[in-house]
Amino acid sequence: MKKEAYFSTAEELARGGLETIPPQMISGKHLIYSSPATLAFNSPGAEGFGVKRAGLAVPDSIMLIVAPGCCGRNTSLISSMPEYNDRFFYLMMDETDIVTGRHLKKIPKAVKEICDCCEKKPSVVMICITCVDALLGTDMERVCRKAEEKVDIPVRPCYMYALTREGRKPPMVHVRQSLYSLLEPQKKKGNVVNLLGFFSPLVDDCEMYELLQQAGVKTIHEISRCKDYEEYQTMSQANFNLVLHPEARFAAEDFHDRLKIPFIELRRLYQTDKIENQYRALGQVLGVSFDQEVYKKAAEEAVERFREVCPDASFAVGECMNGDPFELALALVRYGFQVPEIYGTITAENFVYIRHLAELSPNTKVFSNMEPTMLYYDPSGSGVNLTIGKDAGYYHRDQPNAVWNQDRQPYGYAGVRRLFETLTEKVLQKGEKV
């Protein structure tokens, strides 16, 4: 094996097309390298919103993790957080459980025991199971129904199946469906909207809130801003849903099928002209014309302030951050900056950005974090002087890094403005150290 990290250029990828992506870029075609750069990204309990933390987005919910010790232990970090220290419970599986499946009979009893010991009755119990039960073929829906009979509150499955990560319904897609499956039909209100997609709120200064108010919306629901289970239930009063992340698409379709709430899908973008077009299209659907000039101007001014302090910016863009690495890289190139390297997972949805990158920056190198040859990655000679994403920061430890992986979600013009303000701050901090 050659001792250098495998990559393809944007031009090579675009020329071959989506059907001929090199096997090195498809994690299901080779051994997975758990790069230290992506440990938080790979571990469902380590950082950000993995399956376990996401499963507790419903107010007053608790979670029972049914797993061998090796699968459950990475939850200990989340359990130490004040808002979660009394919401995680464990049912440990031993070898006999795995061979015989006897743990399935223990689950309803465990759920009842947990609910009896809680000071406040939980709103819902999420049962998180792992690849072990995927391989056993466990019918978790049936197990949850048995548990519901014992406690008389909703019990829902939560699948932490790494095996399904590249399937039709990956774990983070399924957990979103589970979260919203608890909503009961209610009378619709014309001035209520749900924002679906994230497990934490948009940044408070996101223009989305004010633009929706321009359209006559009075109430904007986000699951993470619901104070209690009763407020969470009012999400079923929405006139329509805005889907802000593609992993919430299945959940939105469930909304439409069960609760007759239609949805409009938007993308998180870092190109200001594309953001403008997206809001304009949304306004046309809603029958309004959004006044978005002040927000766009603030974002573009932040880009120009950054350009003044770092006109020769040369970026490495990773995937462990709040954004699509290929769309963000394209935005940076269109703003006039260099992007020599991207670390990302190629999908049908983001391949369109690779095609555009191939036209503007054909020599940009694309690496896969999970490809084993990343063990030999060498940053020397890359020309990178600034990084975005935790993984990119790992590969280029001597360069300023914007981790850009905060819980509060950057979106729209506010996301662009905040990103470039952060980058400006990082560059100035490096100058002070020098």
Region spans (language model):
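An N-terminal assembly and electron-transfer interface module characteristic of large anaerobic redox
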Residues: M1-V434
